[in-house]
Amino acid sequence: MIKRYAIVWSRLIVIAGILFTTSLSAAEIQVMISAGFYKAYSELVPLFEQETGHKLITTRGPSQGDSPEAIPTRLKNGEPADVLLMIGASIDDLTSQGLVRAGSKVDLARSEIGMVVRAGTAIPDISSVEAFRKVLLDAKSIAHSDSASGIYLSTTLFEQLGIAAQLKDKSRKIKGPPSGEPVAAVVARGEAEIGFQQVSELIHEAGVSYVGPIPAELQQETYYSAPLATAATQADAAETLIRFIASPRGASAMADAGLAPLSSK
């Protein structure tokens, strides 16, 4: 009987030791993420947390701009971050400012700018540059994001098409999450006739019809990447997260979200 109790106790001690070790190794990973990658990320969060025991603390904000919610602003203000999931071009700027660890960036996915109209309305032809230009001129109102895609449209593309002056008064910049909303929501309510954002931020939204990507000749491809923040306190756990996102399961989630995965290690 004594021997039996000894065996039981020894097993309990082993189990307790495993649980204690797991609790010690589990980390709270601070993640900053832009909206274009959020759909894929949100699908992976419960899987990652269940398999690793780590907890993801997520902060959302645009990759570019100087709003209080923008990731560059958050980092400059000293908000905690271990890993960033955002546009690669912005990461290069943050690296030069010493806010991102040089050499830590892993490229994850490619995205394009797309267009939506309100559900139930006619789908316009944007298959050529001229057709797209006509749609812009004919539209009564246009909505675009306050992040990378919208900045490109309002500062480069409209000028390139020679119609910036005609579009100025009918174009509207939409503040995105966390305190704002997707461009598609504005279009769905009928507050804008057409809307533009990253494809991954459009195709799963209710109340709109996805028209397609803007013409290839005008397209600005966006690359989403994941680096470590210079101030990361959970670098090892953050690297585990990056590898998980770059895995085949991560690639599947990215594809489902409308992104083109770059790796599936």
Range-by-range predicted roles:
Residues 4, 14, 24-25, 79:
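N-terminal cationic amphipathic segment used for targeting or macromolecule association
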Residues 26-69, 73-80, 89, 93-97, ...:
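Exported/periplasmic ABC-transporter solute-binding proteins
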Residues 85:
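Phosphate-/polyanion-interacting regions in eukaryotic proteins
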Residues 10-22:
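Bacterial N-terminal signal peptides
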